[in-house]
Amino acid sequence: MKNTGKRIDLIANRKPQSQRVLYELRDRLKRNQFILNDTNPDIVISIGGDGMLLSAFHKYENQLEKVRFIGLHTGHLGFYTDYRDFELDKLVTNLQLDTGARVSYPVLNVKVFLENGEVKIFRALNEASIRRSDRTMVADIVINGVPFERFRGDGLTVSTPTGSTAYNKSLGGAVLHPTIEALQLTEIASLNNRVYRTLGSSIIVPKKDKIELIPTRNDYHTISVDNSVYSFRNIERIEYQIAHHKIHFVATPSHTSFWNRVKDAFIGEVDE
């Protein structure tokens, strides 16, 4: 069975096993008449781990409606694993049978407003975190224009449902199924004593809601967006909302369901 002209981009990390898989898969795709295209692909195959999938997402974050993703892992199982490195024949066969079906997950939109009028816009697949560079961060949390609390602590992170299994989970946040289009705000080492209090638990807000963080001091803050880190001074406010666009994965018989991904990543085999 031959392909009908699908354009595919392969993105791999520099590890020897990933590079070996990259060359082998590239050869198989060419032999089956797929088109390799690294600017306007139909499908992007990430080879490596979850970090590589995040890099692939950010490379094509402005083409999300036109691109579908596949995660091919060359190491231990990751959350975004669709195929393992020994399943290349299976992957190529499923690509030949592909009908365009997709599985979609929400994406986080982040707007950083600076006091000089600049606005920096980011998208995150997993989460966006903010910390103060050298001391306790103090920031007002506003939900839909209504002041909620004044936070004091190391920082805050806002995660998507798929990102709820990443940094958010290590902070004690809840795991959300991606069909629940919501954001989760989780504290990083909040300061709670007789003088200062915060809610002390994660906040889950629905798709239509907007979370604003307003730092009370104008010094440097570090903002992490997935696997990228930025430093800003004189932040006026930061807005977080579910983005209009979603990330789409190729829906094949091998696409692992969300709860199976959670089980494989964190629990493993369950004894009967």
Swiss-Prot record:
User: InterPro entries this protein is in?
Assistant: ATP-NAD_kinase_N (IPR017438), ATP-NAD_kinase_PpnK-typ_C (IPR017437), NAD/diacylglycerol_kinase_sf (IPR016064), NADK (IPR002504)
The answer on whether this UniProt entry bears the keyword Kinase reads yes
Q: Name one Pfam family in it.
A: NAD_kinase_C
Enzyme type, top EC level: transferase
Q: What are the GO MF terms of this UniProt record?
A: ATP binding; metal ion binding; NAD binding; NAD+ kinase activity
Per UniProt, NAD(+) binds at: D50, G51, N126, E127, R152, D154, T165, A166, Y167, N168, K169, S170, A189
Catalytic activity reads:
NAD(+) + ATP = ADP + NADP(+) + H(+)
User: For this protein, what is the EC number?
Assistant: 2.7.1.23
Keywords, A to Z, come to: ATP-binding, Cytoplasm, Kinase, NAD, NADP, Nucleotide-binding, Transferase
Provide a GO biological process annotation: NAD metabolic process
Cofactors, names only:
a divalent metal cation
Location of the active site: D50
**Where is it found, in Gene Ontology cellular component terms?**
cytoplasm
What pairs make up the disulfide bonds?
Answer: none
Q: Does the keyword Cytoplasm apply?
A: yes
Q: Where in the cell is it found?
A: Cytoplasm
Q: What does this protein do?
A: Involved in the regulation of the intracellular balance of NAD and NADP, and is a key enzyme in the biosynthesis of NADP. Catalyzes specifically the phosphorylation on 2'-hydroxyl of the adenosine moiety of NAD to yield NADP.
Q: Member of which family?
A: Belongs to the NAD kinase family.
Q: What is this protein called?
A: NAD kinase
In the UniProt record, the gene name given for this protein reads nadK
